[in-house]
Amino acid sequence: MSKKLEDIKEYLIKNNMDAYIAFSYENSNTLLKEILGKHFLTRKVFAFFNRDKENYLLVNQLDYPFVKDSDFKIFVYKTYQEMLALEKEMIKDYKRVLVDISEDGVIPSISTADYGSVNFIRNQGIEVFSSGDLLTYLNCRIDEKGFLSMQEACRINLHIKDLAFEKIKEDILSRGYSDEYEIQKFIADKYEENDLFFDEPPIVAVNNNASNPHYFPTVNSSRKIYRGDVVLIDMWCKLKNKDSIYSDITWMGEADENVSLNVEKRFNVLKNSIDLALLYLHDYLSKRDVYGYQIDDVVRNYIRDKGYDKYFIHRTGHSIFSDLSPHGKGVNIDDYETRDERRIINDIAFSLEPGIYMDDFGMRSETDVFIHDNVPVIVGGRQEKVIPILK
């Protein structure tokens, strides 16, 4: 039995679930594709991962020749009537099962089971629960090698960040201005020099360009950076090794010798909200279950108390793993875009990145957190003060 199958069984036992039921059509389910292999499967496939007995596969007769797996007892259907009859027989003893759903469908990354399949199970009198925590447990835990890769990516990323702000200073002092796109390209070139992977170029945004959280400059659309401007740099990268973990950070600077009071005031709101999130994790992770939405609430409530809640227009943080993009598939720190009721468990990583996006300028502060032995470990550095770029 593979490690992943052992992990599923262990999770079912620990959480008193009879089974995890997964569906796939034309290899759409990435977990089943990983377990069964990348076979040419063209019809609906059911996988029944059982707690107390062997696992079952229910496959169409056309797909059966391509499915040879000793970890499953295989059942074959020809017609849809046979498919439903066999499924009904397989689940008749279940009382509590996990399926790839989220409450009200608010977490799209795990809401992949279709209405009819879920409804069929419920119509047999079976309680259906979200597999979200199981999928985090299976797919988003970071091993020691992955953690070391994340540390190294963060170390290099933070150094390149320093170089980028230094270049802005040099540009302004030498010619009177810098340029968003030029700094973006400077960072991307440094990534290439250090053999780092990034899916998209970094965000370099000045003043109210930074009021759009996903603004980024292009060669044909870029703004100059002058003395007195507020500068946001959001940058993400990872090592090119297999299964390496992303670094994703955002830092703020002001192109002057000193930071203005208004900029400092807003930044301190963001900094303090992150401090409260980390304190909450320190206080409660070892005592009880902590969910992604709860950390978002801690951050958002503080920002609301300071009068900036309508300017904080996205979730507090996202899962970080080895995916193509820095946005992983695990628990997000979110009670705004979604209500993420997935648990924060050991060996996962996520960002904390609250923002305040007003008409004059936008701000965001972002670091990366790894959970080790129920303790939040800051991997992405912490910005304590806005950088006075010209100092």
Label every PLM stretch briefly.
Residues 1-391:
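Active-site neighborhoods and metal-handling regions in enzymes and metal-associated proteins
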